[in-house]
Regions:
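Iron-sulfur cluster-binding cysteine motifs and their immediate structural context
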Residues: 2-24, 35-72, 77, 81-97, ...
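Nuclease-adjacent, charged terminal/linker segments that flank catalytic cores
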Residues: 26-28
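Iron-sulfur-associated redox domains of electron-transfer enzymes in respiratory
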Residues: 87, 92-377
């Protein structure tokens, strides 16, 4: 009787007990390729993948003959899923927390030169023990000169992206560096369709550096790939460091700051539409609103994709002449930025918290939000 698993194994790692006819796998020969498991029609062989391998949607992680994990940089899109899923802490994102502490000290707590913190809108759903205003106060106590919403950068981006979409007729978003990297590495024919706009983080960082040349800028958010983004030639001059929400919490803890007992600081730069960038669908809503506010006669037909599997399907459809959409909103994480690998919480109500945060915006339109740019000091 033929055994499919034995034939599937190219390493001759599978043999059979002549008495019981049960399969025996020689671990000295097995390389955990999983071909035997796929070939067995009885599911007698189970292939338990490492959490990091299972989490990686672009198949960038493999193991060598010594069972050490390897990351293929030619495939990796810096989504951070492996970091989040590894239960052993074996994979870590590079931290700039020491560099930020040194920069704050060197600036004499923003007295010699101002250090701006740009906070991602997903922060509104993260710190359950304190209000957002109290968290903003905590950030200032760490030594930052000012705290600004990345959502304001989102307002700026959506305004320009709406114009670009109407001119080109088809566009993919550029806000998520993981999505942009995914296109460049897997769908080169679509690279020309990526929006030319910088991300909200970089757009706002650029503005801050232009009005305050000696300023330093630190982005704080849920994202690992932002740490790679700031190395890009188009971005490196605008954002100095990236911290995750986890690293922000570590800094707050290191100073024994009890945010829940602090007075609230105001954070009211952005519009509702800029703030909802934090969840899937928010970017598309903002582009629609921007077209409306600028009186541009163009109907946006968005395809909203969250998570790399959905992004893959969307990009495959984009190459079809029968596509029925003209804009792809791509986010590397499920549910958008609120599903980021360095979020402090991944709860169903996070989307509700972001929408609530959006509804509290003082600036009701994108145009109003852009109009407050001059007030950033």
């Amino acid at each position: 009787i033929a055994h499919r698993c034995e034939k599937a194994c190219h390493r001759a790692a599978i043999s059979f007990n002549p008495n019981t006819r049960t399969a025996i796998i020689d671990k000295t020969k097995c390389v955990n390729c999983g071909l035997c498991s796929k070939a067995c029609q009885y599911n007698a062989i189970q292939n338990f993948l490492r959490p990091c391998v299972q989490a990686c949607k672009v198949k960038a992680i493999s193991t060598d003959e010594d069972f050490a994990a390897k990351i293929d940089d030619n495939k990796c899109v810096q989504c951070g899923a492996c970091v989040y899923q590894c239960p052993f802490g074996a994979i870590m994102d590079k931290s700039s927390i020491v560099d930020v502490i040194k920069m704050i000290k060197d600036s004499d707590f923003s007295k010699k030169y101002p250090i701006y913190a740009i906070v991602a809108p997903s922060i509104s759903s993260q710190f359950k023990y304190a209000t957002l205003g109290q968290v903003v106060t905590s950030i200032k106590l760490l030594g930052f000169h000012s705290v600004v919403e990345a959502a304001l950068g989102a307002d700026m981006v959506s305004y320009e992206e709406a114009k670009e979409l109407s001119e080109k007729g088809f566009l993919t978003s550029s806000c998520c560096p993981t999505f942009v990297s995914f296109i460049k590495k897997n769908y080169p024919k679509l690279v020309e369709n990526i929006s030319s706009n910088l991300s909200p983080m970089a757009t706002l960082g650029k503005y801050i550096k232009e009005i305050t040349p000696n300023a330093k800028v630190v982005f704080i958010g849920p994202c690992v790939s932002k740490k790679q983004e700031i190395k890009d030639e188009r971005v490196k001059d605008y954002v100095d460091y990236v911290l995750t929400f986890e690293e922000l919490q570590a800094l707050i803890d290191s100073r024994d700051i009890d945010a829940s007992k602090l007075e609230e600081s105001v954070l009211d730069n952005a519009s509702y539409f800029g703030r909802i960038f934090a969840r899937t669908g928010g970017l598309s809503d903002a582009v629609k609103q921007s077209l409306k506010e600028q009186n541009i006669d163009f109907e946006v037909k968005p395809l909203v994709c969250d998570g790399l599997d959905n992004c893959k399907m969307g990009l495959i459809k984009a190459q079809s002449p029968a596509r029925d959409f003209n804009f792809i909103e791509g986010m590397g994480c499920i549910n958008g930025c609120i599903g980021g690998p360095c979020c402090l919480t991944h709860e169903l109500r996070d989307k509700t918290e972001v929408d609530k945060y959006g509804n509290l915006a003082k600036e009701k339109t994108i145009s109003d939000a852009i109009g407050v740019l001059k007030d950033i000091k």
